Amino acid sequence: MNLNATLFAQMIVFFVLWWVVARFVWPPLVKALDERSSKIADGLAAAERGKEALALASNEAEQELTKARQEGVQRVAEAEKRAQMSADEIRANAQAEAARIITQAKQDADQQVTSAREVLRAEVAVLAVKGAEQILRREVDAKAHGQLLDQLKAEL
């Protein structure tokens, strides 16, 4: 065989093979590679969107958690304030009740002292009358000397 004819035949076979590959094999390969590239790009984009969504959700969750903590602190502060107000109110009521009881006790004591003084005055008046009777050896008329006895009670 001739080297030129073999080389020429190989070139024709090569170009026919190249044409068949370029016409029937290469487009599906390029299409498959493009589809895979597109899927990879879509996957990367979806991953990026997911990452952004996760960051956004994480920020929102952190904000909600911070808000919940602040509300909890505020509720605790309000509860402490109400408890302090209740304690102050109870303390004020107790002080008012104690003052009322003390005032009532003082009034009762004053009334008992006044009553005891009146009883003592009456007894002293009776004793004074008896003493005067014994001194004078005569009976003093309580009706006749009522004004004098009342004056004596008032002075005692």
From Swiss-Prot:
Q: Which organism is it from?
A: Polynucleobacter asymbioticus (strain DSM 18221 / CIP 109841 / QLW-P1DMWA-1)
Q: Gene encoding it? A: atpF
- In what way does this protein cross or attach to the membrane? Single-pass membrane protein
Q: Enumerate the UniProt keywords alphabetically.
A: ATP synthesis, Cell membrane, CF(0), Hydrogen ion transport, Ion transport, Membrane, Transmembrane, Transmembrane helix, Transport
The text of the family note is:
Belongs to the ATPase B chain family.
Lineage: superkingdom:
Bacteria
Chief location: membrane
The opening ranks of the lineage are: Bacteria, Pseudomonadati, Pseudomonadota, Betaproteobacteria, Burkholderiales
Q: Which HAMAP family match?
A: ATP_synth_b_bprime
Entry's Gene Ontology molecular function annotations? proton-transporting ATP synthase activity, rotational mechanism; proton-transporting ATPase activity, rotational mechanism
Please verify whether the record's keywords include Translocase.
no
| Name of the protein described by the UniProt record | ATP synthase subunit b
The regions listed as transmembrane in this protein's record are: 7-27
Give compartment(s): Cell membrane
What does the record note on quaternary structure? F-type ATPases have 2 components, F(1) - the catalytic core - and F(0) - the membrane proton channel. F(1) has five subunits: alpha(3), beta(3), gamma(1), delta(1), epsilon(1). F(0) has three main subunits: a(1), b(2) and c(10-14). The alpha and beta chains form an alternating ring which encloses part of the gamma chain. F(1) is attached to F(0) by a central stalk formed by the gamma and epsilon chains, while a peripheral stalk is formed by the delta and b chains.
InterPro entries, sorted: ATP_synth_B-like_membr_sf, ATP_synth_b/b'su_bac/chlpt, ATP_synth_F0_bsu_bac, ATP_synthase_B_chain
Q: Which Gene3D superfamilies match?
A: 6.10.250.1580
The function of this protein is: F(1)F(0) ATP synthase produces ATP from ADP in the presence of a proton or sodium gradient. F-type ATPases consist of two structural domains, F(1) containing the extramembraneous catalytic core and F(0) containing the membrane proton channel, linked together by a central stalk and a peripheral stalk. During catalysis, ATP synthesis in the catalytic domain of F(1) is coupled via a rotary mechanism of the central stalk subunits to proton translocation. Component of the F(0) channel, it forms part of the peripheral stalk, linking F(1) to F(0).
Q: What PANTHER family does the entry give?
A: ATP SYNTHASE SUBUNIT B, ATP SYNTHASE SUBUNIT B', CHLOROPLASTIC
Kindly state one GO CC term assigned in the UniProt record.
plasma membrane
